[in-house]
Curated annotation (Swiss-Prot):
GO terms for cellular component: nucleus. The lineage of its organism: Eukaryota, Metazoa, Ecdysozoa, Arthropoda, Hexapoda. A zinc finger (C2H2-type) spans 1-4, 10-32, 38-60, 66-74. Keywords: Developmental protein, DNA-binding, Gap protein, Metal-binding, Nucleus, Repeat, Zinc, Zinc-finger. One of its GO terms (molecular function) is zinc ion binding. Belongs to the krueppel C2H2-type zinc-finger protein family. It is found in: Nucleus. The gene is Kr. InterPro entries: Znf_C2H2_sf, Znf_C2H2_type. Its main location: nucleus. Disulfide bonds: none annotated. Krueppel is a gap class segmentation protein. It comes from Bradysia coprophila (Dark-winged fungus gnat). One of its GO terms (biological process) is segmentation. This is Protein krueppel.
Amino acid sequence: ERTHTGEKPFKCPECQKRFTRDHHLKTHMRLHTGEKPYHCSHCDRHFVQVANLRRHLRVHTGERPYTCEICKAK
């Protein structure tokens, strides 16, 4: 497994950063191309990664999934 060997055979042609998986390189390349395929249906924001869109959607839904360990507020 590449995780344990440190092997990173997929190299970005723009900045030379290396990746263990080809899909990680593909996602990374969006930083260079400016492609933002994930669109918010509530506003005009666009995102490179779907995880960033999911986090952003909390702005619209009011979801606050994390609780403060000290005061228990969300």
